[in-house]
Amino acid sequence: MDKPVCLIDTGSDGKLCVQQAALQVLQQIQQPVVVVAVVGLYRTGKSFLMNRLAGKRTGFALSSNIKPKTEGIWMWCMPHPTKAGTTLVLLDTEGLEDVEKGDSKRDTYIFSLAVLLSSTLVYNSRGVIDNKAMEELQYVTELIEHIKVTPDEDADDCTAFAKFFPHFIWCLRDFTLELKLDGKDLTEDEYLEFALKLRPGTSKKVMMYNLPRECIRKFFPCRTCFTFPSPTTPEKRSILESLSPAELDPEFLEVTKRFCKFVFDRSEVKQLKGGHTVTGRVLGNLTKMYVDTISSGAVFCLENAVIAMAQIENEAATQEGLEVYQRGMEKLKSSFPLELEQVSSEHQRLSSMATQAFMARSFKDTDGKHLKALEGEMGKLFDAYRSQNKQVGLETHCDLLLYMRCKDPLILHVYFFPVNDARSKEKVEQNERSSLPISHPRPDRPFQVKTPHVLEVPGASVYPEEGISFRTDVEPNFFKVRKLQVDDVQMNLVRQKDKMSVWTTTIWKEEFVHLQQVRDERKLNSEIEKNDFFNAHRVAFIERVTNVKSIADKLHGQRIIHKELYSEITQTNVTRQQIMRKICDSVDSSGRIAKCKFIDILQEEERCLLEDLKQSES
């Protein structure tokens, strides 16, 4: 994040609400989080301290007048500067006791949320720790009214909170006292402990004096104090964020540096009751849960929060494990059909991976309820995949197209594709428009899908030698057969794994001779015929010829079109009709011989078109 975002604000109903944009940021953070929150009276410089922890001059808004800038709770996430693989989450809260708001209940909620969400709580105040400062920290005495460790109200006491509450840091701003007691120097922590010292007695006055101190001592056994001198002169306070380090008091900078180092070194990763590590995703869910509790008027219960979080995380862990399993099985599915042993082996491997993914995210699944749910769902999916593997392995009927490409040497193309697959049939006919179709019997036995089949043709070369697999999800593959001498051709299609013959036919030599005669008869023979045919159908050539590139290559190879025109029509971005117009213009201007050669090329490349045009003349 390059700047803070609002995490908790006030909704239209006047209640606190979580901002969806901030939740989305937290949902993306899978790392453990260290959460540092700052609370304190408004206009005491909380945001300045947070910006220093972020290593920035600006970020969290600073106010230069009596109106506070921060409202609700703002969040800034960044990589932890000293703990690898950890995210630092800074929470800046709105100032307490804002005279404009005048809502003590809201202040208590803000303070309670800061305590519940943070692993380190920074309390920021001005001056010294005296009775006034303690009175301003009244919210700590109210924590026990709003937060409970267990649902059993009688079981809670102040000491129970200490295990789950954050490290407490009291930052005293504009501190001017000399740290001495009875002539002896005091450390900042010793000063804090002196200020928290209890008075003996049971009078109401003594009890009122001791109450906030006793709560701090019991709620926050881990506590620290930092005393900051004034950062600059009074007239420059309004532009504090724009001042360079050279313009700030050196002692203030030294304390700030110590404070930041302490926070980075001592702040622990946030944990739930029971020791579960909090990630950004979990922090987002906790925030939503706590704010919803406030809206309902209920009391925060740490144990209930853990139970609710366990439910959320374990359901998500189940889904995560299931996705790991499904991704792997879907990949395996592309190779169906497979032996059942292979499918079962992959099921076991992926089940183990899915369980590991589940265990990495789940917590407190003590009865194994969610793990059993994951195993049950994987079992259902396995049954479905096993059934699909069996279905894919079923036999299905196919169609066959056979073409003669040329007679000397004899070259045949043999295509297989599903029965009634019009798209595949059209594709094959388009590819073979210059070939001659051969009549043949349709296969009367079904083929096994995705299983290799080999075509046996005695006395001929067949490619691919390893065979082809019959598939329903790709364009039809084909065998290429080459035979030097034209005689009877026997074909036998064999399923490779069990050597079963699924189709056989014989094509007699006379059929090939007849096909060649048909091809020869269809050709335009005399120069006069070809010249007249060109002149009659020039417009049709421009509009209907499709193999433009192949025709241009042959025309250029026979020097019918010159190099400059060939480069122009093959390298520029023009339409097929524009190219054919240029070709026809060039052929037309070159005379009868060029027209004859052009028609010869068309008889090779556009046989169907020429036959159609000849039929239209009759």
Swiss-Prot record:
It comes from Danio rerio. This is Guanylate-binding protein 4. One of its GO terms (cellular component) is canonical inflammasome complex. It catalyses: GTP + H2O = GDP + phosphate + H(+). Highly expressed in neutrophils. The keyword Cytoplasm applies. Keywords: Cytoplasm, GTP-binding, Hydrolase, Immunity, Inflammasome, Inflammatory response, Innate immunity, Nucleotide-binding. The keyword Coiled coil does not apply. It comes from the Eukaryota. One of its GO terms (molecular function) is GTP binding. Residues 30-268 form the GB1/RHD3-type G domain. It is an enzyme of class 3 (hydrolase). Belongs to the TRAFAC class dynamin-like GTPase superfamily. GB1/RHD3 GTPase family. GB1 subfamily.
